[in-house]
């Protein structure tokens, strides 16, 4: 396929984007809005953003969700701007500097919250800055300006959502159904690999792939939840299926690890059962039936605990999977599974990374302010706005540098494209609403094609072009103003890029160490006799951290294996029959305190001291378990955990 070719699957979204832009433009001018450009720009960004992220037409609900986030972010930003202006209107420089800090603060929060919701916080940061900069000459018009911006943005979002509904958005339900079947077959094949106890690299690749697919399925669940209220029951089942899928991975990998020291635990009966190849979910269903009969015949005590747990989790997976596909009423048996355990949310391991993002955004905005005041350039405010936009949106993404490059390419492409519209097309079409709408529809259509291909600069070109062409009411054509706006965008993007290059993000290794220590803390916290604490489901949070670790350190198998071993230790100790008495309960609290000190330690020396203390306490704990005659189901996992911590002590304590 050629570089400028148009694929059939890209046409529908391109038409959808063109329709959203035309609707926003028509409504903006029909109702005599002062700046219809904001409505058009909002419609374009809300519609095109999810398509750029997805690399194609987004699924149903994605545009609506992004629109809601934009509304929330805009309102938060407007309220913050009003508070800042009312408090500091007599000190304009201080007011702008506080806005720069606010933009940095919002970027800091957006780096800590879920990535799906980070857009709202990033937007609220630069919205306040836009308002404060725009009203510099007429501060008394702030409330009116904020209200106009909010209303025009809501109109733009409404147009994007309406266009999405008009062109029958894709439902993700069929993809979810197919992935559920495929995932169960892959889980069975992973257990086959683990029982064969073959090549460790093959097993690592298999479970790593399943972790990614389970994370992707959780993302599909979020999309399905946004799509329609009729999928509420399916959404509840999919939440439980996420935990079950992670449980299956954990039990399979533990089966592999057990065979390193005690291969005789896996009997020939189960080895023969798992030798049967499976291709479809029906094959897996038949095999599970056979296994349940064998377990009933041999008895639970004669069945390895990992296999027993795996068969139970796979059976529950099958039951809930049928419910998701049919979307029928939840049965009593399903309700029992769904009411299982409260899911625990884990604290973010990226606090240092978030602080780097805060300084990058704050410093780049302050640098833009100084540049504006020093040069007195009429479009310095435009450069400042672009700095805030780029840094606020780029920081949350895995590669901020590439996002900046995308914006630079986009603003450079917007200069000749905007020039064509400003000098030729708009002056000749402004007397006819039909021709004006058609001219912008053509722009939206062709950029919509490129956005779906994730063409570098396409998203930036769409936003930058709409931002600099004259779409105000009334239209005024001042070439110097157009050139200033276009150059301001380019300079702003370049200044943001320079700051990102200068303020290096060296938090990667620290984040990795914090993540590994959080795995250790989770394993230690599982040693408890508290009934409420034992019922807490930390598995989704732990695998979410493992997924982050895999993204931060691709190909670093020792780190992944260590993290997975800690997850296995957590699950095994959580279910272990620890003797209930006051002596052990007090010591459990001491172990948790020491593990927390390891995570929060500010220096390597403190961390090593607390980690050494934790190892000593674990040795004492093993002695206490011997005194209280704890069963092997408790002593073996604790011994295995202590051995792992001794082995990887340097990796867990050194920065």
From Swiss-Prot:
Domain of life of the source: Bacteria
GO cellular component terms given for this protein: plasma membrane
Regions that span the bilayer: 13-33, 38-58, 69-89, 93-113, 121-141, 152-172, 370-390, 407-427, 431-451, 459-479, 482-502
Disulfide bonds: none
Predominant place of localization: membrane
Cellular compartment(s): Cell inner membrane
One Pfam short name: FUSC
UniProt GO MF annotations: transmembrane transporter activity
GO biological process, one term: carboxylic acid transport
Purpose of the protein: Forms an efflux pump with AaeA. Could function as a metabolic relief valve, allowing to eliminate certain compounds when they accumulate to high levels in the cell.
Record-stated family: Belongs to the aromatic acid exporter ArAE (TC 2.A.85) family.
Name under which the protein is recorded: p-hydroxybenzoic acid efflux pump subunit AaeB
Organism annotation: Salmonella enteritidis PT4 (strain P125109)
